[in-house]
Structure formats: structure tokens, C-alpha cells
């Protein structure tokens, strides 16, 4: 079956509506643009990164059903591609049921993964996948009881948050009330529910980028895997990542089994970021995102097709190639200040090494711990690549302007 794409801004245009316009969405837009797709980007604030490279952009509250429905009716997209969790998913379920547009990867996947409760119950209770022990709580009293039940130390996360917001490690009962307050401040869409997880004794954690794409000859959906990505987090937020992460053949096989099971249950086509804990040959499921993953920024330097190109190809029904050509690493560049209209200097020094690269996201406003860019590096092994990526990131100087 032939895949046909039209011409942007013409009546034949194939339209994609991106819901959420951050740095990951920006790379997806660029990948779609290269294939002649007309892209419409939406977010809650103007001049978001993906908006800067899209054909059209819109500012709205995507968690408001009326606003979201109005936008979809206006754009009339072929595909709706969510980049964030804070979306009125009931609208997407309705759109999919009416066959008005195709939701990527599926409305079910977006609805289930928009909060940690839905996906954890699917993974642990329906699919029987190994996870940490967990409880949910929606009041301070039930939270205190759940923390005591799980034991200490434990990890607390709002069921709806991203980039580590509202997450904390609770070492004793004395820290419980403060953790509750912090989680309430960090959650999105005022959900008011948290997950309490037991601490797993693991060697390392990985992201297994898993791609569901149609076989061009048979039309059947097949599952492909990128090499495992190792990563380091600080307070739940990605700081650096590298590919490949060495692991035993048995652990890799189990990781693929778990990733296949959860992504098959979610359905649809596209890339999924499956987060897993590894200890020896043992593997535990942690989380899944039905879209490109921040730790996957390393694939810009390591793979023939980055996670963004893989996502674009998969959702358009095109063949994918998950092969890696290099050992690589990525390191985050933070704003370091609370300011807008920032400048980035010393770039010539940062990029002096031929195996390094930068992505500066163009975010209009910076916060001390806001991710404003990423450095990537290739090297003979992951240790050297990590060192080079961090050196490159550290050499970028973020400056304020009056």
C-alpha cells in the first residue's frame, strides 16, 4: 500500500497537530517538515520551541475540553500528536471514536499514560509486569498511612507531573508532611493524587526506546528497539544520558519483553520511551511515555535515525531503522537564572571538538533549573562520551540581557 503525502499550505496538505511544543516536539516538527508535512503546533504559551519551526501555532489551555475541541475543528488535522500529559484526553477519545483524526499512538495510550496511576495499574495489575511496591493517596491522612505501609525510604510523585516536578525521596516519617506539600505544588492539572513507591535496589536505570511501525510489505505493525539508553537523574529530572548502556543478554531480553507487552497493550504506531530498573538479570518496569523521551536526545548523535525521525516515520506509516552508528552521550544545559531574553556565549569553544554538537531550544523564558539546551558527543566508549558531552555543556555560558 502506497504512502502518499501532499504539499504544505495546499489543499493536498497532510496535516499534523502537535499538542505541546517543547524541545522534543521541536525536533519532531523538523523531522515532519523534512517529509513535507504541514505542522500546526499548540502550547499554553507563545513562542514555544516547536512553534518556532511549525507552519502555524496556537496558544490555549489544552486541558480545557472546549478550547481543545475548537482547535481540532479549526485545523482539521490528519494526525494529532500529543507531546505532553496535560491534555483533555476525553476530547481525544471522542475524536478517535468519531474517526475525525488519528491520535498518536492512540487515544487509549494518551489517556492511560497521562497519569502514573493509569499506567501503573495497567502494567502491574493487568499485564502482571514486575514493578516496585506502590500505593496511591489523595489525602494527607491516607498518604501518611501509605508511606508507613510501603516503608522507608520511599519515593513520592504526583500522578500528573513531568521533569521531576513534585517528586521527592522520603527517608522517614518526619519528612512525610513536607513531601505531601511538595507533591501538591508540583502536580499538573490539580490532580491531588500521588503515588508512593518502594525503593528498588537497582544497578542502573535505562530508557528502552520502543518503536511500533507498520511493515511496508505486509501492513502489519512490528516492534523495533533502539539500543538501551543509560541515564542519570537529579530529583527526577534527566541530567545526562548515554547509549548504549551495557547490560546482560538476559536483562536485555527481559527489558524487550516488558517493553513489547506494555506498548502492545497501549497500541498504535510511534515511539515509546519505556523506563526500566535493572539489577543483574532482573528488570522492573518504571514508566512509559507514548512519545519521544528526553533521555533519547542522545540519539541525535548515536543513531542513523534519531528518536524524532523514528517517531515521524512511524506515525506516517514509513519504514524505520533503529540501528546505532556511534557511542554517544548527552548533557543538559540549564538556564541557571530566572530571566527571559537570554543569550548563549562561548559556543565556538564548546563546539571546538569535531565530535560534539549543541541544540539550543530557544525557550523565551529561563528558570534556574529549566532545560535550555543539550550538548551531545560521540567517542570510543560511554565514559569518554559522557565526559566530552558534559565538558561541552559546561562551556556554554548563559547570559542575561537587559
Swiss-Prot record:
E.C. numbers: 6.3.1.21
What functional role does this protein have? Involved in the de novo purine biosynthesis. Catalyzes the transfer of formate to 5-phospho-ribosyl-glycinamide (GAR), producing 5-phospho-ribosyl-N-formylglycinamide (FGAR). Formate is provided by PurU via hydrolysis of 10-formyl-tetrahydrofolate.
Q: Which NCBIfam families match?
A: PRK09288.1 (NF006766), purT (TIGR01142)
What pathway is this protein said to act in by its record?
Purine metabolism; IMP biosynthesis via de novo pathway; N(2)-formyl-N(1)-(5-phospho-D-ribosyl)glycinamide from N(1)-(5-phospho-D-ribosyl)glycinamide (formate route): step 1/1
Q: What is this protein called?
A: Formate-dependent phosphoribosylglycinamide formyltransferase
Pfam families associated with the record: ATP-grasp, PurT_C, RS_preATP-grasp-like
Q: Which UniProt keywords apply?
A: ATP-binding, Ligase, Magnesium, Metal-binding, Nucleotide-binding, Purine biosynthesis
Kindly give the SUPFAM superfamilies that the UniProt entry links to this protein: Glutathione synthetase ATP-binding domain-like, PreATP-grasp domain, Rudiment single hybrid motif
Q: Does the keyword Signal apply?
A: no
HAMAP family in alphabetical order = PurT
Q: Which GO terms describe its biological process?
A: 'de novo' IMP biosynthetic process
- What positions does the entry give for ATP binding? 116, 157, 162-167, 197-200, 205
Kindly list the GO molecular function terms attached to this UniProt entry: ATP binding; magnesium ion binding; phosphoribosylglycinamide formyltransferase 2 activity; phosphoribosylglycinamide formyltransferase activity
**Residues given in the record as Mg(2+) binding sites:** 275, 287
What GO terms fall under cellular component here?
cytosol
The record, for Gene3D superfamilies, names: 3.40.50.20, ATP-grasp fold, A domain, ATP-grasp fold, B domain
Binding of N(1)-(5-phospho-beta-D-ribosyl)glycinamide occurs at 23-24, 83, 294, 363, 370-371
Q: Which family does it belong to?
A: Belongs to the PurK/PurT family.
Q: Which organism does this record belong to?
A: Acinetobacter baumannii (strain ATCC 17978 / DSM 105126 / CIP 53.77 / LMG 1025 / NCDC KC755 / 5377)
Describe, as the record does, how this protein assembles with itself and its partners: Homodimer.
Q: Please write the reaction equations for the catalytic activity of this protein.
A: N(1)-(5-phospho-beta-D-ribosyl)glycinamide + formate + ATP = N(2)-formyl-N(1)-(5-phospho-beta-D-ribosyl)glycinamide + ADP + phosphate + H(+)
Q: Does the keyword Iron apply?
A: no
Amino acid at each position: 500500500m502506497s504512502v502518499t503525502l501532499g504539499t504544505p499550505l495546499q489543499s493536498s496538505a497532510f496535516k499534523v497537530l502537535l499538542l505541546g511544543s517543547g524541545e522534543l516536539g521541536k525536533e519532531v516538527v523538523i523531522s515532519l517538515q523534512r517529509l513535507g508535512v504541514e505542522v500546526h503546533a499548540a502550547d499554553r504559551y507563545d513562542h514555544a520551541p516547536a512553534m518556532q519551526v511549525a507552519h502555524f501555532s496556537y496558544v490555549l489551555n489544552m486541558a480545557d475540553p472546549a478550547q481543545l475541541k475548537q482547535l481540532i475543528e479549526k485545523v482539521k488535522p490528519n494526525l494529532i500528536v500529543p507531546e505532553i500529559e496535560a491534555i483533555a484526553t476525553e476530547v481525544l477519545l471522542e475524536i478517535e471514536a468519531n474517526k475525525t483524526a488519528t491520535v498518536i499512538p492512540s487515544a487509549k495510550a494518551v489517556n492511560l499514560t497521562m497519569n502514573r496511576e493509569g499506567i501503573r495499574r495497567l502494567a502491574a495489575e493487568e499485564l502482571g509486569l514486575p514493578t516496585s511496591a506502590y500505593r496511591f493517596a489523595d489525602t494527607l491522612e491516607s498518604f501518611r498511612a501509605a508511606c508507613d505501609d510501603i516503608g522507608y525510604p520511599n519515593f513520592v510523585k504526583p500522578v500528573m507531573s513531568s521533569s521531576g516536578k513534585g517528586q521527592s525521596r522520603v527517608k522517614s516519617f518526619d519528612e512525610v508532611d513536607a513531601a505531601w506539600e511538595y507533591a501538591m505544588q508540583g502536580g499538573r492539572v490539580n490532580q491531588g493524587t500521588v503515588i508512593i513507591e518502594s525503593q528498588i535496589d537497582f544497578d542502573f536505570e535505562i530508557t528502552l526506546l520502543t518503536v511500533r511501525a507498520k511493515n511496508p510489505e505486509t501492513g502489519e505493525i512490528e516492534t523495533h528497539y533502539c539500543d538501551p539508553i543509560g541515564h542519570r537523574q537529579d530529583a527526577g529530572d534527566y541530567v545526562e544520558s548515554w547509549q548504549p548502556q551495557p547490560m546482560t543478554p538476559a536483562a536485555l531480553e527481559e527489558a524487550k519483553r516488558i517493553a513489547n507487552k506494555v506498548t502492545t497493550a497501549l497500541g498504535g504506531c510511534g515511539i515509546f520511551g519505556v523506563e526500566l530498573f535493572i539489577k543483574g538479570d532482573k528488570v522492573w518496569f518504571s514508566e512509559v511515555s507514548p512519545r519521544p523521551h528526553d533521555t533519547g536526545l542522545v540519539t541525535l548523535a548515536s543513531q542513523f535515525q534519531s528518536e524524532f525521525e523514528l517517531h515521524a516515520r512511524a506515525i506516517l506509516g514509513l519504514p524505520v531503522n533503529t540501528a546505532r552508528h556511534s557511542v554517544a552521550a548527552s548533557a543538559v544545559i540549564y538556564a541557571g537564572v530566572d530571566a527571559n531574553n537570554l543569550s548563549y556565549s562561548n559556543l565556538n569553544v564548546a563546539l571546538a571538538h569535531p565530535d560534539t554538537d549543541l541544540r539550543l531550544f530557544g525557550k523565551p523564558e529561563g528558570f534556574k533549573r529549566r532545560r535550555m539546551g543539550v550538548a551531545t558527543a560521540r567517542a570510543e566508549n560511554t565514559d569518554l562520551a559522557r565526559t566530552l558531552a558534559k565538558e561541552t555543556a559546561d562551556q556554554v555560558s548563559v547570559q542575561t540581557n537587559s
